[in-house]
């Protein structure tokens, strides 16, 4: 007698022919008809034929018959389907009538959701696909978390092979979120049965009157490269991809799920035109095509969306209805966008803070930086109060404005200010944050002297820097020569000179904004910490003025005078505003959000949902397109928050394009290659990286995470691609990577550095790079924004006044008479500060349903024993990394991450426990995707 057995957790999936023991103890019978009906796995002495229905992706239908018995093609079996459905939620009371309409619809129509079972194999008689088995689902009166359960019973003939796909049609009047579909023998408990076929969908299904096409889903039991696709679903695999590509025509509707490409021609407005990003003049990655009509006032650009902040993204890329925090965030960003409009109309509402104490007054010392606020908490409070107070606030001035802001915004004290109220002032902290702050991706090694610009001298002025060998030696107290400092890797630099200099005169024409090209030089002390030794600010020559430039040093100007110390603090404001702008526009937006969107689009257009690489990358793409669309609508658009509160102003996105053109290379986006490019690491003879600064928290933690990601990707790839020819012959994989290059990044498609997917090593490097950028890279530059830049003197986003010494004797006299006033006038205005704080606070938050690296496991990974085992190894490595980071943060010798008043570096510490137990948002772990 055969008995049902349950596979061991982590056991590798076995071929169908070896799975005869996966039997069902009981099955449901129907009254007999001319066709004999048999329990699946029956152990009756009179019926010994067993039909296996559990391996839905087997290469062929297999039957096991004991000797002396024949297989009866007329046998049938009853299978049950359960479907979890989440109907669209309703937020406001005036929409409750929609819920009543739903109930009435269910009562009248009864069954509005149909399900079809599709065989994984062809009919051996016809050589064509089997006829599908269709049925209507009915409400089971059961619920599962936020989902209602629907079910149906299907009678299947034995000759129908296991389900290779399911197809659904929604005849309801509204869309629904499809959770999971389970197919299993009737009479079995799906939570205990080993014969369950699972379809993990998590997809919005439109009403049939909006989209008559049937929605297709494939089971998670096994992933297939194209050549291994079961014959019965080969056509469905191809047709699903064709549906997602669309035809490139027409305006996209909200319910569409089409992925296509377009240039960034939607950032301008009729009254504020902006150049198109993407093309020869302004190279840029591509974004998702919306198909909106061209603007009548600017034919090169799209019309604005009819609803402010509403931009098309494929339906399954949008936030789930259950993400109330995301919903409120979107509304608040819209309100902040309204503040930007107020700035444009009311140019006189740009008062400076009257004192440093007035800046500190914005924070509530009793309100600590808690990771999550209940039921929207702070965000809902801000939204409600903004709606009532916005008009009143913009009319206030001076102290009244500050007090009004305090009433509306209950800002927590950022960690940098909470740990040490004077941290922002210290030069040591200024230098430390280049290694462990919110932008640790810009610091680079100085490899030669003199420091020379690559810009045209005739256009911009002399190329040689004023930071000379003599100045360097003086600043390091002549303990070594400048040449020795270079040879011993003691000199490091923040270099924003060549990137910003071409925009200086254009930015200076804007109201209340200024800019320089800047270089900041640091010296590496014997204790492993950096200290700044010089800042060079440059204004390029113009038709009316000669080049102006000057070097500022800490405590050295005017022979160590007080005036020189104040000038040093002003110079730091300018450098920090450059660093903040570069961080937001390049390190953050360009290198993560913007450059990743083409990977997402190409993956959905070219990789089937049953493709193993799609299933590996899918969790790393979660919500990225929706966040990017919101950014285009409210953050990076004309007169948006970035333009109004960051130094480059309306030229912000042009600078981002220039950085993409001159700096971005896919092969340099992997952490090791990025460190090597900046001179921050070299590869030793043993292949291991040696850091130029041993205590470099971002690199120390990041390399551990990178190695874990790469090993996980390597194990995964090895499981599905035993040899290189499998990679080369995978048409979907090759088409995906070709499309990333030719359609997603077409302005760089002919660059020689694009890797070829021709072996295990190259594929792993490509996948690990994408996984790194979407997870750890983004976490490092995103979740430290408010903790570090939420206190404006520590990392101002804008500098509003030129250096007094540039402007002449009168400005210098005014500066000497009131240096603190000039310093405060150089910082962002009160309103700009509040806008930046509110925006960074939101962007730095974690979603309530965040999926964290090393903790979230896709259902498809769990179903494959080898993949599950590899993930467990990855998971353990991430836990080990978390423990290592904790040890380093307690190590007195690591002064860049531990010490009195020093904020520990935890941005790349993997989640180890419950994220809700974290003390700060920075400690909550590394999300899989570019998400907020």
Curated annotation (Swiss-Prot):
Gene3D superfamilies referenced in this protein's UniProt entry, alphabetically: 3.10.450.60, Lipoxygenase-1, Domain 2, Lipoxygenase-1, Domain 3, Lipoxygenase-1, Domain 5, PLAT/LH2 domain
Catalytic activity from the UniProt record: (9Z,12Z)-octadecadienoate + O2 = (13S)-hydroperoxy-(9Z,11E)-octadecadienoate; (9Z,12Z,15Z)-octadecatrienoate + O2 = (13S)-hydroperoxy-(9Z,11E,15Z)-octadecatrienoate
EC number: 1.13.11.12
InterPro entries linked: LipOase (IPR000907), LipOase_C (IPR013819), LipOase_C_sf (IPR036226), LipOase_CS (IPR020834), LipOase_Fe_BS (IPR020833), LipOase_plant (IPR001246), Lipoxy_PLAT/LH2 (IPR042057), Lipoxygenase_dom_3 (IPR027433)
Stretch list, region Disordered: 270-311
CC cofactor note: Binds 1 Fe cation per subunit. Iron is tightly bound.
Domain Lipoxygenase, chain residue ranges per copy: 223-932
Bias type Basic and acidic residues, positions: 270-284, 295-311
One GO term describing the cellular component: chloroplast
Record-linked SMART domains: LH2
MF annotations from Gene Ontology: linoleate 13S-lipoxygenase activity; metal ion binding
PLAT domain span: 79-219
Subcellular location: Plastid, Chloroplast
SUPFAM superfamilies reported in the protein's UniProt record: Lipase/lipooxygenase domain (PLAT/LH2 domain), Lipoxigenase
EC main group: oxidoreductase
Bias-annotated ranges (Basic residues): 285-294
Associated pathway: Lipid metabolism; oxylipin biosynthesis
Alphabetically ordered keywords of this record: Chloroplast, Dioxygenase, Fatty acid biosynthesis, Fatty acid metabolism, Iron, Lipid biosynthesis, Lipid metabolism, Metal-binding, Oxidoreductase, Oxylipin biosynthesis, Plastid, Transit peptide
GO BP annotations, alphabetical order: fatty acid biosynthetic process; lipid oxidation; oxylipin biosynthetic process
Summary of the function given for this chain in its UniProt record: Plant lipoxygenase may be involved in a number of diverse aspects of plant physiology including growth and development, pest resistance, and senescence or responses to wounding. This enzyme exhibits linoleate 13-lipoxygenase activity.
Family, per entry: Belongs to the lipoxygenase family.
The protein's name in its UniProt record: Lipoxygenase 2.2, chloroplastic
Source organism per UniProt: Hordeum vulgare
Lineage per the UniProt record: Eukaryota, Viridiplantae, Streptophyta, Embryophyta, Tracheophyta
């Amino acid at each position: 007698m055969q008995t049902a057995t349950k596979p061991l957790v982590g056991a590798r999936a076995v071929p169908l022919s070896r799975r005869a023991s996966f039997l069902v103890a009981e099955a449901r019978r129907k009254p007999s008809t001319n066709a004999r009906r048999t329990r699946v796995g029956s152990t009756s002495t009179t019926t010994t034929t067993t039909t296996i229905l559990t391996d839905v992706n087997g290469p062929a239908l297999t039957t096991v018959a004991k000797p002396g018995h024949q297989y009866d093609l007329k046998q049938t079996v009853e299978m049950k389907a359960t479907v979890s459905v989440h109907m669209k939620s309703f937020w406001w009371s005036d929409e409750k009538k929609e819920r009543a309409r739903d109930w009435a619809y269910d009562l009248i129509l009864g069954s509005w959701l149909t399900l079809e079972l599709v065989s994984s194999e062809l009919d051996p008689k016809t050589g064509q696909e089997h006829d599908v088995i269709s049925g209507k689902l009915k409400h089971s009166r059961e619920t599962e978390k936020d989902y209602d359960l629907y079910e149906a019973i299907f009678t299947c003939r034995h000759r129908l092979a296991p389900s290779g796909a399911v197809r659904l049609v929604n005849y309801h009047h509204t869309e629904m979120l499809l959770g999971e579909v389970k197919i299993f023998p009737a009479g079995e408990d799906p939570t205990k049965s080993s014969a369950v076929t699972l379809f993990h969908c998590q997809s919005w299904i439109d009403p049939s009157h909006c989209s008559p096409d049937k929605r297709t889903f494939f089971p998670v039991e096994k992933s297939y490269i194209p050549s291994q696709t079961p014959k019965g679903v080969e056509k469905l695999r191809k047709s699903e991809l064709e549906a997602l590509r669309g035809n490139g025509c027409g305006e996209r509707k909200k319910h569409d799920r089409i992925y296509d490409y377009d240039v960034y021609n939607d950032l301008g407005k009729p009254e504020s035109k902006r150049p198109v990003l993407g093309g020869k003049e302004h190279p840029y990655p591509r974004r998702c095509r919306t198909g909106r009509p061209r603007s009548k006032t600017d034919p090169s650009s799209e019309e604005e969306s009819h609803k402010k902040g509403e931009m098309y993204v494929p339906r399954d890329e949008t936030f789930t209805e259950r993400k109330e925090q995301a919903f409120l965030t979107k509304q608040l960003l819209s309100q902040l966008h309204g503040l930007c409009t107020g700035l444009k109309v009311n140019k006189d509402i740009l008062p400076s803070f009257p004192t440093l104490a007035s800046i500190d007054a914005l924070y509530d010392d009793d309100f600590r930086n808690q990771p999550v606020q209940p039921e929207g908490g702070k965000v809902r409070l801000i939204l409600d109060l903004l709606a009532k107070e916005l008009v009143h606030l913009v009319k206030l001035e001076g102290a009244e404005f500050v007090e009004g802001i305090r009433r509306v915004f209950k800002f927590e004290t950022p960690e940098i200010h909470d740990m040490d109220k004077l941290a922002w002032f210290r030069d040591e902290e200024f230098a430390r944050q280049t290694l462990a702050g919110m932008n640790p991706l810009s610091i680079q090694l100085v490899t030669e002297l003199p420091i020379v610009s690559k810009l045209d001298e005739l256009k911009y002025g002399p190329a040689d820097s004023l930071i000379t060998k003599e100045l360097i030696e003086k600043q390091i107290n002549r303990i070594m020569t400048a040449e020795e400092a270079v040879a011993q890797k003691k000199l490091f630099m923040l270099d924003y000179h060549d990137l910003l200099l071409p925009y200086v005169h254009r930015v200076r024409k804007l109201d209340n904004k200024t800019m320089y090209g800047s270089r900041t030089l640091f010296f590496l002390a014997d204790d492993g910490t950096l200290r700044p030794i010089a800042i060079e600010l440059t204004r390029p020559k113009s038709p009316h003025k000669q080049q102006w430039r000057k070097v500022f040093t800490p405590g050295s100007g005017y022979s160590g005078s007080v005036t020189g110390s104040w000038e040093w603090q002003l110079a730091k404001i300018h450098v920090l505003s450059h660093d903040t702008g570069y961080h937001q526009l390049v390190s953050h937006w360009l290198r993560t959000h913007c450059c990743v969107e083409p990977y997402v689009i190409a993956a959905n257009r070219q990789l089937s949902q049953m493709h193993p690489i799609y299933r590996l990358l899918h969790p790393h793409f979660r919500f990225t397109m929706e966040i990017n669309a919101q950014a285009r609508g409210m953050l990076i658009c004309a007169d948006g928050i970035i333009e109004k509160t960051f130094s480059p102003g309306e030229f912000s996105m042009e600078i981002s394009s220039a950085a993409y053109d001159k700096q971005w290379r896919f092969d340099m986006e992997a952490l090791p290659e990025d460190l090597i490019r900046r001179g921050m690491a070299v590869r030793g003879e043993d292949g291991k990286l040696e850091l130029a600064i041993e205590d470099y928290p971002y690199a120390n933690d990041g390399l551990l995470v990178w190695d874990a990601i790469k090993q996980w990707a390597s194990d995964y790839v090895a499981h599905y691609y035993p040899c290189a020819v499998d990679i080369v012959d995978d048409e979907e994989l090759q088409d995906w990577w070709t499309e990333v290059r030719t359609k997603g990044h077409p302005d760089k498609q002919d660059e020689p550095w694009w890797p070829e997917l021709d072996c295990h090593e190259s594929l792993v490097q490509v996948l690990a790079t994408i996984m790194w950028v979407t997870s750890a890279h983004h976490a490092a530059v995103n979740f430290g924004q408010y903790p570090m830049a939420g206190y404006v003197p520590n990392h101002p986003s804008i500098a509003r006044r030129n250096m007094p010494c540039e402007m002449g004797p009168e400005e210098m006299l005014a500066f000497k008479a009131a240096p603190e006033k000039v310093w405060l006038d150089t910082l962002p205005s009160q309103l700009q500060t509040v806008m930046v704080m509110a925006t960074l606070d939101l962007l730095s938050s974690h979603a309530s349903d965040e999926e964290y690296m090393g903790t979230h496991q896709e259902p498809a990974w769990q179903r494959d024993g080898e993949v599950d085992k590899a993930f467990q190894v990855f998971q353990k490595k991430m836990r080990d990394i978390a423990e290592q980071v904790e040890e380093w943060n307690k190590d007195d010798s690591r002064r860049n991450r531990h010490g009195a008043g020093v904020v520990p570096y935890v941005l790349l510490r993997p989640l180890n426990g419950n994220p809700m137990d974290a003390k700060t948002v920075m400690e909550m772990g590394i999300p899989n995707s570019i998400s907020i």
